[in-house]
Amino acid sequence: MNLLIDRMENPGSRNCTLLPPSFPRGFCKGRRASSGDAVKIKESGLQPQPQPEPLQAKTNVAHFSKSSSRLPVIAVNDNPVVPRPSTEVNLGSLLQKEREKEKEEQPALHDRRHLYVTKNRAHGVRQRSLEMTSLPVLGSTKTGKFSDFLFEDDIDNRVGRHSRSYSGASSLDDPFRVSPKTDFNSNRARLSCLSKGRRGSMSVFQSCHTGLAFNQIQGSSSSQRRSSAGSFDYERKRLVNQFLQPSLGNSDPFDTLRESVVFEPSSTAGGIKLGNMHSQSQISVNSSPSTSLFYHDLDGSAVNDSSSFLYSRSNVPAFLSSSAFSSTSSTSSDSEDVDRRSLNGVYPSLGYLTNQRKPRNSSGSSTAPGTDTLGFKYLLNRQKSADSSTRFKSVLKVNNNNGSAATPDSSSNSISKSNSNLNDNIDELNYYQNHISTLLVKIENEMRRNLNDTIIKNENNVQKTIQKYDLLSGELTLLLDEMTTLRTTVINQFLVKLKSDFDEDDNKAFINELKISVEESVAQLQGLERRMEVCQERLNKQKSSLREMDSLIELKNVLNKSKNNTKSIYLYRYFIIDIIAFLLMGGFIVYVKNLLTRFFTR
């Protein structure tokens, strides 16, 4: 999630540490340079390319040494598996095969015209060898976001910027704009790579396609890239915005082009020309990496299916500039009439496209057409013939019949063949645009329905809440008024009286009266304490007297008890005396008897 947020906040930069090891180090440098950093990219010159074999060996060793320090080594039978090297090696092998094929197909030429063509071909081969050594900037961050264009109309905002970006040959609408000279040679290699990508594998097409797109960076200075970074951000968003717009009517931008139309940037005129081989072999239109990436991503299904989305005319975005289909100056009035009749008869949507793009070219600038025609060039060259000698002979025959001094063009027949095949997929015209627009309408209706249901359900609650809020606001206002009145009363009345009561200078003040009463109470308390001391002494005396009285009472009780006891004995004293007397008398009688008995017995 952090990576996604960082990518949305910084769409022009990429963390190179997260890229797979198969990407070379120059990939990240190109990204930083396109974002306006101080990293400078060397401009490509007309220097020979090193041999592919040493480059491949060097790339393998460097790639293995770099990746082995970060990744675990995978071995099969104790032999390390070296990862697939950079696509630069594949491009080198592709270039070598192309050189060998051109040498085999090149006929024996002797005159000046043939030598000129041979020289141009060799120059194109050298230029392609320089252009295929770098990888382009590829990433979803260069295509903008769908949410930036769905609910806003930026036609008025685009007019000023577009007119400024195309106002001169030196002004760049994005960091990847290159000069006409550089674009002339780069487009030659691009056409060849696209044709080989259809015959070869998908990886070969990706390598060639990406290498050509990134080479455009090397044709511009770092200061120009920094000054036009904002325009490039606009350009990438404009691509997605115009692709998602539903088509109006039956207009198709590619219906306005025909076989004899060649776009050539010039400082004096930006119209439709019939040029020599040097100009006809290229469609000199600057294309941004956003467009390249857009069609490159859509090419996955187009390689195996000729009726796929990429090859159908419904895929064509409606953003080609009208300057590519108009001419301000011409070398021949006959050619202009032929072009006009062909455009009006075969491609009826030219007027619509011109009216749609008229505000963008109101400044009267005579620059190259729009920068998003790489998809058109790819469609025109998707069925390029492999037999170059046949193309050469057919073009040479046409030039000889017309008596013109123009050199033969190796791509004119391919344009006518590809134009004839554009009608194969007419059933799919505007299918995807209509499908996307229909889905957007359905989504919008669903959103509106849900919004209305929610509003109807919650409207009563909102009204009740507002009423409660109004009542609470009124109560709070009344409470605030009461608090203000109370504060005024306290300040003006109670605080004044309180201050007067505690004024020490006033003898009649409450504080002074309180002091006097407290002093009097203290004096009374002191007198009470003295009286309490006297009472305590008296109490001690009374306690001693009470103790004596208690002892006397106890003695008296004992005497009373003894008296009571003596009284009971006194009552029975005569009885006791009688008993004692009887006992004595009985004893005396017994004694007397004994005596008498003894006496008589003697």
Swiss-Prot record:
Residues 31-55, 83-108, 323-369, 399-419 are annotated as: Disordered. It is a single-pass membrane protein. The modification Phosphoserine is found at residues 167, 342. Pfam families: Hph (PF13694). InterPro entries: HPH_family. Residues 352-369, 399-408 have a biased composition (Polar residues). GO terms for cellular component: endoplasmic reticulum; endoplasmic reticulum membrane. The chain crosses the membrane at residues 575-595. Keywords: Endoplasmic reticulum, Membrane, Phosphoprotein, Transmembrane, Transmembrane helix. Phosphorylated. Is dephosphorylated by calcineurin. Residues 323-333, 409-419 have a biased composition (Low complexity). It is found in: Endoplasmic reticulum membrane. GO terms for biological process: cellular response to alkaline pH; cellular response to salt stress; post-translational protein targeting to membrane, translocation. Residues 96-108 have a biased composition (Basic and acidic residues). Calcineurin-dependent protein required for growth under high NaCl, alkaline pH and cell wall stress. Present with 251 molecules/cell in log phase SD medium. Interacts with the 2 calcineurin A subunits CNA1 and CMP2, and with HPH2/FRT2. This is Protein HPH1.
